[in-house]
Design a protein with these regions (language model features):
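Conserved helicase C-terminal RecA-like lobe
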Residues: 95, 297-298, 327-522
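Helicase P-loop NTPase motor core
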Residues: 204-207, 212-306, 332-334, 396-397
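Conserved helicase NTPase motor core
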Residues: 21, 46-50, 54, 96-198, ...
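Proline-centered turn/helix-capping motifs that create local helix->coil transitions or kinks
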Residues: 87, 173, 228-238, 399, ...
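Short glycine-/polar-rich loops that comprise or flank the Walker A/P-loop
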Residues: 17-20, 171-174, 180-182, 203-208, ...
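Conserved beta-strand -> loop -> alpha-helix junction used to position metal-binding or nucleic-acid-contacting
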Residues: 17-32, 303-327
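Short, polar/flexible loop-turn hinges at active-site or ligand-entry regions and domain interfaces
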Residues: 12-19, 35-47, 57-70, 86-97, ...
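P-loop NTPase Walker
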Residues: 1-40, 140, 194, 223-226
Length: 522
């Protein structure tokens, strides 16, 4: 908003421009709340406290994997989606919790904020909408202050923002919006291009101006983007023209797997840097999900090519399902790792109670203590002895075969299927993580070597993220790359089931927009 204000002021000498309010929905709405309901900066719940609070709520409800950062993040996103859509929480289908669990977590989170006298960023929108809807004096005052409204990136607004906008703009309807439904890729956050497409139904006498020239990309790229996006049905019919002429190259490759793909890209970039005297910062590798960055990180580290990860520093190895498999491997290397024994002893379920685990959690010989100090049924004893034998076998395998053995012979995949069935959620995402983890172990001879590699990767990514001066190839997701531009772009994993992604809310349209935007980025 500061950038937009400075640009506006540079284009006009009218002193009244200084009186214009510039801001995001959150900042403008929070200003309204501060005026009418006496909120202040101290009222805002910071993200760290929010995550800690939700983590404690999940643990208090004995929800499995409550410590997992990705699970916590997913729950945060789902609560946000429900609020931004003005949904009844009972109608929402969570991808990580059962319906009952989600409702309980939602309610406890609301109580948690009330006890702390805090609001989060979603509340800024909800509470402003409710204020304007229920308080005529407040609505009239806001209308008198904001008689003219301009909204940029209108394709990205959500339901609560749109409903509040309609209240403020009515009855004069002096509203000017700029947007492109072809660039709406945030459906998972509640953004809806429908509000742009149906704008004329809500605001009469609308005048529409088509901005159909792209000044960023060359003709070859624009043509491909047009051919892709025209397959969408939920859009205004238009053909984007090129304002840059021709001269770009668009190449396609068909690698056998993610490793071969990463090696090809790494070699291609290295050759271009050496031959053309370009910089590593001139290159970006863009992917649909963070999981896909795993092979890139491995290969670029091995080839000593500098890179910058723009998204979360959480790696595939941090996911709870991957951590379960790695716990099995760590036990193979160190059978005295009680923490890892406790993690996997009931994955799959082996009917060992929490009381028994608490009784022996600090014992030096976990398995012997479990058998001899706990009151186990003979069938349980046999199960534990069989597990001990299996672990001894696993430690002699190479890591890829060891992971395969854990998934099949030790029934970890069956545990995942049961876990998803009990929660009525799809298995695709978790199986994808396990497949990628198994693939990551391909080139290692011993489990110890593989585990050491994982620690190096995690350390490298943390250092990479903390080093603000790192010069290197950009690794980023499509969503994080929106609005940026690069000289050379590689889009990886353009496979059915990845782009469009199986978990996508609007597979037919929104995922084509991802590809179209990435094509135009070059």
């Amino acid at each position: 908003s500061i950038e937009k204000k400075n640009r506006a002021l540079s284009l006009s000498n009218d002193f009244r421009m200084n009186k214009v309010t510039y801001g995001t929905f959150h900042s403008v709405f929070f200003r309204i709340l501060r005026y009418f309901e006496n909120y202040n900066i101290e009222s805002i719940l910071d993200e760290k406290t929010k995550r800690i609070g939700l983590k404690n709520i999940l643990k208090g409800l004995n929800i499995e994997n409550a410590d997992d950062d990705e699970t916590i993040g997913q729950v945060i996103n789902e609560i946000s989606y429900v609020k931004n859509e003005l949904m009844d929480k009972r109608d929402f289908k969570s991808e990580v919790l059962t319906n009952d669990e989600f409702i309980k977590v939602y309610n406890f989170y609301e109580e948690y904020k009330q006890q702390m006298n805090k609001i989060d960023f979603d509340d800024m929108l909800i509470k402003t909408y409710e204020l304007l809807k229920n308080n005529k004096a407040a609505l009239d005052r806001v209308r008198s202050v904001y008689r003219y409204i301009l909204v940029d990136e209108f394709q990205d607004i959500n339901k609560v923002q749109f409903e509040a906008l309609k209240l403020i703009a009515n009855p004069s309807n002096n509203i000017f919006v700029v947007g492109d439904e072809d660039q709406s890729i945030y459906g998972f956050r509640g953004s809806r291009p429908d509000f742009l497409l149906e704008f004329e139904e809500y605001f009469s006498n609308t005048k529409k101006v088509l901005l159909d020239i792209n000044y960023r990309s060359k003709g070859e790229i624009i043509n491909i983007a047009n051919r892709l996006i025209e397959k969408n049905t939920n859009r205004y019919e238009k053909v984007i023209k090129c304002g840059q002429g021709n001269g770009a190259k668009v190449n396609y490759i068909s690698p056998e797997d993610s490793e071969e793909e990463a090696v090809y890209i790494a070699k291609d970039i290295k050759n271009k840097v050496q031959e053309d005297y370009t910089e590593y910062t001139d290159f970006a590798v863009i992917y649909r999900t963070n999981i896909q960055s795993r092979a890139l990180v491995d290969v670029f580290m091995d080839m000593r090519i500098p890179f910058v990860v723009k998204d979360s520093i959480v790696t595939i190895y941090d996911h709870w399902a991957a951590q379960d498999i790695l716990a099995y491997l760590r036990i193979g290397v160190n059978p005295n790792s009680n923490k890892d024994w406790i993690r996997i002893i009931n994955k799959p379920f082996r009917y060992i109670s929490k009381d028994n685990l608490n009784l022996i959690k600090d014992e030096p010989d976990f398995i012997n203590s479990l058998i001899n100090k706990c009151d186990l049924h003979p069938k349980q004893v046999k199960t534990i002895n069989d597990l001990d034998i299996d672990i001894s076998y696993v430690k002699g395998l190479n890591p890829k075969n060891a992971i395969s053995y854990i998934r099949t012979t030790l029934d970890y995949d069956r545990y995942i299927l049961d876990y998803c069935a009990n929660r009525k959620i799809k298995t695709n995402g978790l199986i994808e993580i396990l497949n990628e983890l198994e693939s990551s172990a391909t080139n290692f001879k011993t489990i110890q070597e593989y585990l050491e590699h994982i620690e190096r990767v995690k350390s490298e990514i943390v250092d990479n993220k903390n080093n603000k001066e790192t010069d290197g190839v950009i690794f980023t997701t499509m969503h994080s790359a929106k609005g940026l531009e690069f000289k050379n772009v590689y889009i990886i994993g353009a496979n059915e089931g990845t782009i469009p992604h199986e978990k996508s809310y609007e597979i037919d349209d929104e995922e084509k927009k991802n590809d179209q935007i990435e094509e135009e980025r070059r």
